[in-house]
From Swiss-Prot:
Basic and acidic residues bias (residue ranges): 280-291
GO terms, biological process: formation of cytoplasmic translation initiation complex
Protein name: Eukaryotic translation initiation factor 3 subunit H
Single GO cellular component term: eukaryotic translation initiation factor 3 complex
Protein family according to the UniProt entry: Belongs to the eIF-3 subunit H family.
Origin: domain of life: Eukaryota
Amino acid sequence: MSTISATVAGPSIVQFVQIDSLVVMKIVKHVDSEMYAGLNEVAGEACQGLLTGLVSIDDRRLEITNCFPTARAEPMLDGDEIAQNNAFYEEQKQAEMLDMLRKFRDMNIDYELVGFYQAHPFGACFAQETIDSLIDYQASVPDGVVLIYDPVKTRQGQLSIRAYRLSTKALEMSLDGDWSPESTRTAGLTYENMLEELPVVIKNSHLVNVMLAELALEGDCAIQRSSSHLELGTRRSLEKCLRSLMSDVDDLNRTVMAYTKYVADKQRYDLTVYNAMQKRQAENEQREARGEPPLSFDDIKKMKPPQLTTKCGMLESFLCSSDARAHSDYAAEACLRHFSFSSFCLCFFNENIAKLFLAEAVVDSHGSRDHGGAAASVR
């Protein structure tokens, strides 16, 4: 969890996010270059960078005017001192960030940090590291956001950039470090309202607006002729999405089992404490009747309550639920956009479906044969 112990600076006034087209192009270029180079598999972390801009108080708008990528961690080799290398990497990363902000200031570019961006396939960005980074930003900058870029949808022709921030209740609970089931229930916090999604508006220059208007006037024929050789590649991405969804369901099932065990242990603990309190109360009444001093309840109050065995309390189950919802939303959208249910089964599960129908036919044939043999024996 985040180690920040400061209080929230104040409620955010931002209601939507405005992104310059320059920022969009830099994010897309950065992510595509690293994904084609295979750096995600080597470094084992998301492609990310920092956002700079300003807050328009009158319009209640967060303007993101520029961005720059952050340095990646180099892979550890055998025999290296991990702690020393991590400290050196963090110092180098901090120095590069300050140097870039200094250059922005010298060039009269907005250099105020307003958040960060990350690239996550299918928009499944809900991880502990992302939450910790949001806590760090929003504890000092209440209007800070994270932009989540989906490279899979973008390659299929749909630019996907979404802006998130922690809700006020989620930020307060994160700063307190208390994600127990009782605290989340009292705060009314669920995986649906843990993060707030802000509307995103992309600001283009006048020349770009003119070009888009001309493209709109040309009609669909020219676009269809120029894109007839393109392929959406939905089949492969949907297969990866379903595999990730299966992993999310397994993780979610594990957290649900841990919560179920916690509920049973908590009920058993409450019953034990209640019985002990009632027994001590009756014993004290008898002692008072005999003129003896009553016994203390401190030993009963010191009984250790059960703890949720997940890593970060209810936060882990919230993250698993959000990831599963992101993957299921993408799968549902892809199926509705490109496939009927029958073609979806034929495209992705043709071998398994064929084996299933074959096994069913074999079972039916054996069943009918056994039934016929039994009837013949009766005759």
